[in-house]
C-alpha cells in the first residue's frame, strides 16, 4: 500500500511526513484493517507515546476494521483503559467484531460513528483440530472469550447480559443509529465542527 506524504513548511524549511505520522501530531490514531499482534503493538505504542506527551488531551482513535484476533484487541482495549488520556473512538466505514469492542470501549460520552458506518457484534469465532482433548481446550477458550466479550458489552452499553447473549448469537449488523440506540456509541458525528 502506498502511504501518502505530507509536506509542511517550517521555519527551517520543508519537512515531509507520512500521513500517519502527521495525524499522530494531532493526536489521531488510525486503526484500519485486520486486528493482529503487529497492529496492536503499533496502536499500543502510539497510545502510550501520546499519553506520555500530554495526558490531559484527548486521543482520537478512528476505526475502520473487520475485527481480528481477540487477544490483540483486548491488549489495545486494556491500554486505552490504562492510560490517563481520554480516548475518543470514531467508527468510519466498518467496526466489526473485535473492532466494535474497541469502539464501545472508548471514553463514555466520546464514542462516535459517522452516519454511514456499520457496527457488527457477534460471538467469537474459532476453530480447532487435533486430539479430542486439544479440541475441548480450544472450545473452552472460545467459551471464556465469549463470556468476557459479553461482559464488556454489558459494561459499556448498559444492556442486560441476557439480551447481549441473544443479540450476539449470530452476526448482528447495526447502522450508526442502531448502534447509538444500543449504547455502543454516544453520538453520530455528522461533521467534526458539531462535536
From Swiss-Prot:
It comes from the Bacteria. Belongs to the peptidase S14 family. InterPro entries: ClpP (IPR001907), ClpP/crotonase-like_dom_sf (IPR029045), ClpP/TepA (IPR023562), ClpP_His_AS (IPR033135), ClpP_Ser_AS (IPR018215). GO terms for biological process: protein quality control for misfolded or incompletely synthesized proteins. Fourteen ClpP subunits assemble into 2 heptameric rings which stack back to back to give a disk-like structure with a central cavity, resembling the structure of eukaryotic proteasomes. This is ATP-dependent Clp protease proteolytic subunit. The lineage of its organism: Bacteria, Bacillati, Bacillota, Bacilli, Lactobacillales. One of its GO terms (molecular function) is ATP-dependent peptidase activity. It is found in: Cytoplasm. The gene is clpP. Coiled coil: none annotated. It is an enzyme of class 3 (hydrolase). It holds the Pfam family CLP_protease. PROSITE patterns: CLP_PROTEASE_HIS, CLP_PROTEASE_SER. It catalyses: Hydrolysis of proteins to small peptides in the presence of ATP and magnesium. alpha-casein is the usual test substrate. In the absence of ATP, only oligopeptides shorter than five residues are hydrolyzed (such as succinyl-Leu-Tyr-|-NHMec, and Leu-Tyr-Leu-|-Tyr-Trp, in which cleavage of the -Tyr-|-Leu- and -Tyr-|-Trp bonds also occurs). One of its GO terms (cellular component) is cytoplasm. Cleaves peptides in various proteins in a process that requires ATP hydrolysis. Has a chymotrypsin-like activity. Plays a major role in the degradation of misfolded proteins. The active site is at 97 (nucleophile), 122. Its main location: cytoplasm. HAMAP family: ClpP. Its EC number is 3.4.21.92. Keywords: Cytoplasm, Hydrolase, Protease, Serine protease. It comes from Lactobacillus acidophilus (strain ATCC 700396 / NCK56 / N2 / NCFM).
